[in-house]
A protein has these predicted regions:
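Conserved P-loop
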Residues: 1-73, 118-129, 142, 170-173, ...
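Conserved RecA-like ASCE ATPase "motif II neighborhood" in helicase/translocase motors
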Residues: 59-84, 92-96
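Short basic (Lys/Arg) and small-residue
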Residues: 134
């Protein structure tokens, strides 16, 4: 029986790497599928991992009807055994509904990968809907680490080295062009206390920030 499975974690927990590995495993067994993504750090229409791996993908625009897209390809005779959905936190809730329809109505496995919450600790709408609908929600086992060495559970946004907890999910317009925006992962204790790596003089802040958007 087909399933909708959501793999989630913080930044640096290997979500896109696992998405690419999952696609590779299916392809190596002769299975054919589709890969979707949204706002990948490497640009439009590509899924990339921090390890340097990447693959072409279908960009999920806000108005894309994923279910209709898949049905049309099946109607043209295309074979689709599985679907990979990276950066699923950025999908619209109705697009997540479409993924569930693909699983239940078409019998196609859907593997979604994403981040649960934004820098304000608020669930992304796409992730919230996946938690509500997925057959399984799996937390990634590769643990990202806070600067203190503890397991990182929260994503933090910093502006000029100072952690911010307010503002829109859309980065553009939040700050001026001269401001330095970055993201890093923190344990809950240091996220609540707003103690970043720079503030603690402890070291690394991610040099490859993700574009947290609605």
């Amino acid at each position: 029986m087909a399933e909708l499975i959501y793999y989630c974690g913080t930044m640096d927990s290997g979500k896109s790497t696992l998405a690419l590995q999952t696609a590779h495993n299916h392809k190596s067994r002769g299975r054919t599928g589709l890969i979707f993504t949204n706002k990948d750090r490497a640009g439009t229409g590509v899924i990339s991992s921090r390890l340097g791996l990447q693959s072409e993908a279908i960009e999920v625009e806000p108005d894309l009807d994923i279910h209709k897209f898949v049905v049309e390809h099946l109607s043209m005779g295309d074979r689709i055994d599985y679907i990979i959905c990276d950066e699923a936190q950025f999908y619209q809730p109705d697009q997540i509904d479409g993924l569930a329809k693909i699983v239940d109505g078409l019998g196609i496995d859907v593997y979604a990968f994403g981040i649960l919450a934004d820098f304000r600790t608020k669930l992304f709408p796409g992730s919230a809907r996946l938690v509500e609908l997925a057959d399984r929600v799996n937390t990634l086992q590769v643990e990202a680490l806070c600067w203190c060495g503890s397991r990182a559970t929260h994503n933090a946004r910093t502006v000029n080295g100072v952690m911010v907890t307010e503002g829109e999910q859309v980065v553009v317009g939040d700050v001026g062009k001269s401001d330095e925006i970055a993201y890093e992962v923190l344990c809950r204790r240091h996220h609540m206390r707003q103690v970043t790596a720079r503030a603690s003089r402890a070291g690394h802040i991610s040099s490859d920030p993700l574009p947290f958007t609605e």
